[in-house]
Amino acid sequence: MLVPENMEIERRFIVDAREEKPWRAAGEAVSIEQHYGVGEWLAVGDNALTHKGHVVAAVSEQQRRHLDEVSDWTTRLRRKNATYILTYKSRLTKDTSLELEWTVSSEMAERLLENGPFPSVRKTRYVVTRPDGFVWEVDEFEGALAGLVLAEVELQSSDQSVTMPEWIGHEITGLRSWSNRALAETLARESA
């Protein structure tokens, strides 16, 4: 069974990173910075997301329907190496989310970020394909969250079984206090 377009089914875990870190040798490293709440500065038009009259991204009919039908969105602007991705994400169940994404020019991303500061996190992500074919994303957080390591795996269905790597710890799927947004908001409150 294929996951419907714009749907994401994933499980999340705390990683035991006290000793060996085998995901570093097995995966590609990507630098990521994520800013939350940028959607407050965006307007949703018939066919575009705009910021102060400037088009940020084109919106398809299907995306527009989702934006109209769902009211509980988390908005995120992610810098992944040199690429910026704007995301609207809404949790449907503990492990399933509706996710809309657009690539944004670096110029427009900088314009959006000028409205901040926004709650944010920085991390290095290692993308690891295991022998069973599952792709794990292992995030080593930086800054005030240094030492925290989380992992997630995307699935085709909520009941799909997956073999856990030896470094996987406690499952945190569906625990909102462990979402990247919640971590970013906690850091923002503590630094205020």
Task: List each language-model region with its residue ranges.
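Phosphate-end processing signature that detects enzymes handling 5′-triphosphorylated RNA
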Residues: 1-192
